[in-house]
UniProtKB/Swiss-Prot annotation:
Protein's recorded name: Uncharacterized protein MJ0486
Signal sequence range: none
Family affiliation: Belongs to the radical SAM superfamily.
One Gene Ontology term of the molecular function aspect: 4 iron, 4 sulfur cluster binding
Length: 322
């Protein structure tokens, strides 16, 4: 039985994507069909940091957080300016409607009143159709979700970009994530009760995690009716505990072929109705990247994944039912 939370119109759109020959449910195509136009996500940094840093943080995250290289996306720039400048630039490229994407960091790590001010302001632009908010599973208190639920009731498309990484407790402890699998499950269910959509971020190639466990993560997220996923390879960057493990020979990153093969396997074990927002990372600055050496470009990875799935004669969801 296929597990889905999407409505009938969304299901029709995804079925149409497959009928056109695509081998996985590409989010960009889905959005274009749903809204009859492309929608641009404006990334903004509101400088909220991460509550887990005081506990040492995750082993893959540097002390100061991951740098991003998007022009006009910086906590040093007022939010109004970040939105205005990026919106102006994207309008020149033909975009008319936008999501505001709160990234990086834990973007619910602030009092509810402050967050409401930020979210209200972001939605005050007539061109903005919704929000996408990156956060941790243990930082989604009821009062904050209730505010987001009001936006849903008013017709906005609200997404939580949730740092899942893995659905295995052992792995979360190795990563020093600072939360349990139960927190992930609760966060997803709490969002769904309010009509808030969830995009789970998943990392493949985590220390100590087996192929079977990675595939179980795909199936569990499907059974939790998650709407979308972003899939990433684990990247070793300077100034992290993971870097120490790497130089000691305690961890090795996946090579390109290993990663692409795992992505294909993961997609096969995922419900065909989970949207795929990403299959790789943004470019990691060479100044801080330790490993892997291969190019992480999203378009390249997406094309190679499509090529391998085609060679296998398979597609997303092919092994979800087994």
């Amino acid at each position: 039985m296929v597990v889905i939370m999407l409505n009938y119109d969304d299901i029709k759109i995804i079925d149409e994507i497959y009928s056109e020959g695509y081998l996985f449910a590409q989010y960009g195509i889905y959005i274009k069909k749903k809204f009859k136009q492309k929608i641009f996500k404006i990334p903004v940094d509101i400088g909220l940091g991460c509550p887990h840093k005081k506990n040492g943080g995750c082993i893959f995250c540097p002390e100061m957080g991951r740098p991003i290289s998007v022009k006009y996306c910086s906590a040093k720039i007022p939010l109004k300016e970040q939105i205005k400048k990026q919106m102006e630039n994207q309008k020149k490229k033909g975009f008319k409607k936008f999501y505001i994407y709160f990234y990086p960091g834990t973007n619910t790590y602030a009092p509810a009143e402050k967050l409401k001010e930020i979210w209200d302001f972001s939605l005050s632009y007539k061109e903005v159709i919704g929000l996408s908010i990156g956060t941790r599973p243990d930082c989604l208190e009821k009062e904050k979700l209730d505010i987001l639920a009001e936006y849903v009731e008013n017709g906005y498309d609200i997404w939580i970009d949730l740092g899942v990484q893995s659905m295995h407790q052992k792995t979360l402890e190795i990563l020093n994530r600072g939360h349990d699998v139960s927190d992930i499950i609760k966060a997803i269910k709490d969002c769904h009760k309010r009509g808030i959509k969830v995009c789970g971020h998943v990392i493949l190639g985590l220390p100590g995690e087996s192929w079977k466990e990675m595939m179980e993560t795909a199936k569990i997220l499907s059974l939790l009716e998650i709407e979308a996923v972003k899939i990433y390879p684990l990247v070793v960057v300077k100034g992290t505990k993971l870097e120490e493990m790497y130089w000691k020979g305690e961890y090795r990153t996946l090579d390109e072929n290993q990663y692409i093969s795992l992505v294909c396997d993961f997609l096969e074990h995922l419900s065909p109705y989970v949207l795929i927002q990403r299959l790789s990372k943004d470019k990691v600055p060479e100044s801080i990247k330790v490993s892997p050496e291969w190019y992480l470009g999203r378009l390249k990875i997406m094309n190679k994944v499509s090529e391998i799935l085609k060679k296998r004669g398979t597609k997303q969801g092919a092994r979800f039912f087994r």
